[in-house]
Regions:
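Long, charged N-terminal interaction/targeting segments
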Residues: 1-77
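Ferredoxin-like iron-sulfur electron-transfer modules
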Residues: 14-25, 44-54, 73-96, 101-102, ...
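Flanking helices and flexible, charged tails adjoining ferredoxin-like Fe-S electron-transfer domains
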Residues: 4-8, 78-82, 121-196
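Surface-exposed charge patches
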Residues: 62, 102, 132
């Protein structure tokens, strides 16, 4: 029992250390829902260390050293290593549908329904998750060096992690608020004690 608990503790500590090395883009290109689940999968031996294109070769080498594994080339199935890119919205084509807002893991897109949206270049991790939901195909990825005011490198991992946590908390809070509103509506429509 104690040995199992020690192994779980070591695995948890290793996952935290691995997560500390990951770039926190939360891009899901690794095949996991975010950097933390990927770190946990590496720590327990369920995932290889070469599935993170944003981290590239330098990350793979650091993960190999930390996890005691041999370095591997980046798995091309997960993407290719390249310069930092950011999302850019063609504001003339944006219809303000707001479908790009929820998938952005760090809330780097600002706007309101029925109004033009824009990407805050200094916050964009380059995850590309905003592209697919756009019904008018007005979002494209550009090298950060070609966008005025954009840094050449991705935001620091600790800031991405904090913004990702805040994004998740905001979504949970909104879901709870919507559930409470729905309960009040059902109660108002059906009265107390009457099944909906």
């Amino acid at each position: 029992m104690a040995a199992d608990e020690d192994a779980r503790t070591r695995q948890t500590e290793l996952a935290a250390a691995i997560d500390g090395l990951l770039p926190q883009t939360q891009c899901t290109r690794c095949g996991y829902a975010g950097c933390r689940p990927y770190a946990a999968a590496i720590a327990c031996g369920e995932a290889e260390i070469n599935h993170c294109p944003p981290g590239g070769t330098a990350l793979i080498e650091a993960l190999a050293h930390l996890a005691g594994r041999a370095p591997l080339p980046l798995d091309p199935a997960n993407g290719v290593e390249g310069p930092h890119r950011i999302a850019v919205i063609d504001e003339d084509r944006c219809i303000g549908c707001a479908k790009c807002l929820p998938p952005c893991p760090v809330d780097a897109i600002v706007g309101a329904p029925h109004f033009m949206h824009t990407v805050v270049a200094t916050l964009c991790t380059g995850c590309e998750l905003c592209i697919a939901p756009c019904p008018v195909d007005c979002i494209e990825m550009r090298p950060a060096s070609s966008v005025a005011g954009a840094p050449d490198t991705a935001p620091p991992a600790h800031l991405n992690r904090a913004r990702f946590s805040a994004h998740g908390a905001r979504l949970e809070r909104r879901a709870a608020e919507r559930a409470a509103e729905l309960a009040v509506r059902k109660l108002a429509a059906h009265g107390p004690g009457i099944p909906a």
